[in-house]
Amino acid sequence: MSSISLIPVCTDVAIRDMADMASAIWHEYWPIVLSEGQIDYMVDTMQSFEPIKYEIRQEGYLYWFVLDEEGKRVGYLSVRPETPEGELATDIQPGEGKLFVSKVYLLKEERGKHYASRMLDFCEDFCRANGLSSLYLHVNKHNEMGIRAYKGRGWYIAEDSVSDIGNGYVMDDYIMAKEVALS
């Protein structure tokens, strides 16, 4: 099974590198589902330097580069610990919080190597280490490969979500969730 390591993204240089990787991944992966205009808009407003920096510095998101066995960057991961109400979790009782898995992305040539499974294992371990009893994420309803992979790991569709993201675009997602045993 492929192993990974995760390196925290904290500096402006690392954030810029991550934004470059995000743009490359998004422009390669999403044209089968989203228009080029929506991809550009979402990268600019959610996956570029300023939005990532804001999420890290102001909203409590944690970002990591994912490295393969040789130390090569193969993708990135982002999460945010939250209260049951969806607020940033800073001081909660064990079992009361949840983990928002915001971003799970791999470069094209790195998919199919079980890195995404290791990334999700990391998220579950993060929950156990921090007393968070569940995980959730948003997945595009047309991302059949992602939905199938999550279901195969015990995730379930918790609800439908259609969100206006501005500029005439919407995110048409499923919110998928998974409970985590803390003991």
Whereabouts are the PLM-identified features?
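Intrinsic low-complexity, intrinsically disordered segments enriched in polar/basic residues
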Residues: 1-2, 74
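Short C-terminal domain-edge/linker segments immediately following a structured domain
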Residues: 37, 49, 108-111, 115, ...
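C-terminal "cap" of GNAT-fold acetyltransferases
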Residues: 3, 12, 93-99, 133-136, ...
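Conserved glycine-rich acetyl-CoA-binding loop
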Residues: 104-121, 128-130, 141-148, 152
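A short, hydrophobic/aromatic-rich structural module that often spans a beta strand
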Residues: 73-81, 123-145, 158
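Acetyl-CoA-dependent GNAT
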Residues: 8-32, 38-109, 120-122, 126, ...
